[in-house]
Regions:
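Ser/Thr-rich, low-complexity intrinsically disordered terminal regions
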Residues: 23-130
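Absolute protein N-terminus
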Residues: 1, 21-23
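Repetitive helical segments and hydrophobic/amphipathic motifs
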Residues: 13-14
Length: 130
């Protein structure tokens, strides 16, 4: 499990370096998994089951006062679509990569907002720690 996280971190950093200018990558260790902001999407990996990450996502969205317009989930993936006070569309996509690991993708608006994406991710991550 730990080997997979390290490999994923190396791949994300390698991708970020090879793609150049408009990429900001941050690689965390331990429970935080890996996080990268790439082309308007914040992508992260959490060492938690899809159901847990989905529940944390809904709590985070509610805590931030976002209006959920779509919430769909099956055994392998989930999508939460919300709108903020400026009516920007926020799409949070979750994919189970293993039984115990979930990949998140957060996009705010058409072009993305790194600051808002990171805030949403941090709230989701905080709820996973409770």
């Amino acid at each position: 499990m730990r080997t997979k996280q390290i490999l994923l971190a190396v791949l994300l950093v390698g991708s970020a370096v090879s793609l150049g200018g408009c990429v900001v990558a941050a690689v965390g260790a331990g429970a935080a998994g890996t996080v990268a902001y790439l082309k308007g999407d914040l992508e992260a990996v959490e060492s938690r089951k899809l159901d847990e990450v989905h529940a944390a996502t809904l709590k985070a969205v509610k805590e931030l006062g976002l209006n959920v317009t779509k919430d769909s989930k099956d055994a392998l993936s989930a999508t939460v679509v919300a709108r903020d006070a400026q009516d920007k569309k926020i799409t949070i996509t979750l994919r189970a990569t293993t039984e115990q690991t979930t990949k998140l993708s957060i996009r705010v608006g058409l072009f993305g907002s790194e600051a808002k994406s990171r805030l949403i991710y941090q709230k989701i991550h905080d709820h996973l720690q409770k």
